[in-house]
Amino acid sequence: MDSKLIFFDIDGTIYDHDKNIPESTRKTVAELQRQGHHVFIASGRSPFLVKPILEELGIHSFISYNGQFVVFENQVIYKNPLPENAIRRLLKQADEGKHPVVFMAEDTMKATVADHPHVLEGIGSLKTDYPETDDLFYEGKEIFQLLLFCQDEEEKAYAAFPEFDLVRWHELSTDVLPHGGSKAEGIKKVIERLPFDIGDTYAFGDGLNDLQMIEYVGTGVAMGNAVPELKEIADFVTKPVDEDGIAYAVKELGLLK
C-alpha cells in the first residue's frame, strides 16, 4: 500500500474523555507508522502542550495552533504569527469587556490577569497549570494564537476585527487565529512540502475546529462523539473514542495491510 498522510485531532479523538489514550489507539498509530504512513497530530494546542502526546505515541510531525505552526519530522516548515498591532487593539476591547486573554507563543504562554476562574477552568481542561501573568508579553514576540475567555454571546463584540477568526473550543473560551487560519491551511503547507495528492490524505476529528480539516482532506473521519456539524460533512463516521473509534475506522478504511 502507498503511504498516506493521516492527521489526528487530540481531545475527543486521540484522548478519551478522561484525557487518556485508549490502548487500541496506541497500537493503531504505531502500526500505521510501521507500515510507512505519515502520522500527524493536528491540534489547536501549542507545540509545548502537544509535545507530551508526540513523545507518548512516537510521532514526529504535527500541526499546532490550528494550522499556524507546522512541523514535519521535527523540522518547522511553516509559521504564521498574529500581527502585533491587531493584538494590541483586541486587548483594549478585552479589557473593556473584562475578558482575560492568554498569549500563546512557540514555547510558553502568559495570561493578562492572575487567578481568573474562567482561565482556571479552561486551562485546567488541557491538563496544564495556570500561566504566569504578563499583560505585555506579546510585544516584540511571535504570538501564534490567543485564548480569549468570554461567553458565547459575548463573542459578537469581537466581530469587528477582520485580521482574526474566532473558533470556540470551550464554553468559556475561544481561539483567536489569523483570518483564514485553520488546520486545513496547515495541511496545505504539508502537502506543498511533500509530493502527496489530496486523495491520499485522511483526518480524524470531533470538534468545530476540525470542520475545515475534515472537509479539505481526501477522507474526513468524524468520531462517533463528534459534534453534529462535523458528522454531517464527514466522509465516514466511526465509533466514539471510548469504543475504539480510531482502530475501527482505520480497519474499515483499509489503511492497514
Swiss-Prot record:
Family: Belongs to the HAD-like hydrolase superfamily. Cof family.
PROSITE patterns according to UniProt: COF_2
PANTHER family: PHOSPHATASE YKRA-RELATED (PTHR10000:SF25), PHOSPHOSERINE PHOSPHATASE (PTHR10000)
Cofactors: Mg(2+)
Coiled coil residues, start to end: none
Protein's recorded name: Putative phosphatase YkrA
Binding locations of Mg(2+): 9, 11, 206
One MF annotation (Gene Ontology) recorded for this entry: phosphatase activity
Keywords: Hydrolase, Magnesium, Metal-binding
Pfam family, one: Hydrolase_3
Domain of life: Bacteria
GO CC terms in record: cytosol
